[in-house]
């Protein structure tokens, strides 16, 4: 009975004695736990890895290892007046942790890729190689393009197209020695494959005369259509989109040529599925949709600070980013299981079936003060 006696005594003392009329004090609540340099408690990993199904899962920033203290500054930066941002989404560990839309926009509204589409073309090339539709990156392209037969151009390889080392003029409609504009004039050509083929060598094959050429990518896309027997959007849907529950619409020119270098329309959430696929090394919920070896090769130049295989480097981060005109962004930082996206307000002109026929086309605008690296840095600064 000694233990009971001690406990009873302690209880009475703690209550101010057996018959005391002293008022009880209301206990002060313990402060909510916080994390260093954050006003709330941030959960530390490891984090469960989930996959979106038809719908996405959302989670708080702090539950996924990110501090929400400065999240409003991230949103304010993206949507600063004059930036004409339509949507931003941040995905961590498979959860959407930030999602904001411009006034009047919802998760169901389309965004457009512009040159973010190049990274989709790169992914499909990896699939085509895995399936044996393309035997090697070192295949010469003359077998696909009879227009080049009997000329030195027939020795250009698929790898040359993928790394922008064809030696051809960059712009199919501009001056032959203009290597600075990325060949943007091809967008205004009715038959864009013919335009891309109608370029002459300006230097040795394998020499990097420029860092960017829409025409080179257009031809890489054409090779995938020839070898697969499908339009790019059909091949994309069969190999990636339908499996990931994503709907991608790839634009064509007036001659029915898919624009491999640009112009995919999808919701921002569906673009996020593509980013997550690369954050997870080409795996989607147990299926290896893109060979891991291709993920490693196609992002290797970007991880070493050079544009190649249609991915850009991210300054200061061990990741890679797909970039499109007017600040379209899908940034992937695999070590943080992080996807960061920004899309501009998008108007789809005409009936959306082709580009530059009648009133059909794209409409986005140049943001006044949006910088891709600054935006990425603001998001990654939330990680604890």
PLM feature segments, named:
Residues 1-13:
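Sec-dependent bacterial lipoprotein signal peptides
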Residues 16-106, 129-135, 163, 190, ...:
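N-terminal leader/targeting segments and the immediately adjacent pre-domain N-terminus
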Residues 34-36, 324-384:
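Structured C-terminal helix/loop/strand segments within mature extracytoplasmic catalytic/sensor domains
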Residues 94, 111-137, 161, 220-224, ...:
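Active-site SXXK
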Residues 101, 107-108, 173-262:
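Catalytic-site signature segments of enzymes, centered on catalytic residues
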Residues 131-169, 201, 228-266:
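Active-site helix/loop module of the DD-peptidase/beta-lactamase fold
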Residues 216-223, 262-283, 328-345:
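Active-site-proximal alpha-helical segments within enzyme catalytic domains
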Residues 248, 292-341:
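Active-site Gly/Thr loop motif
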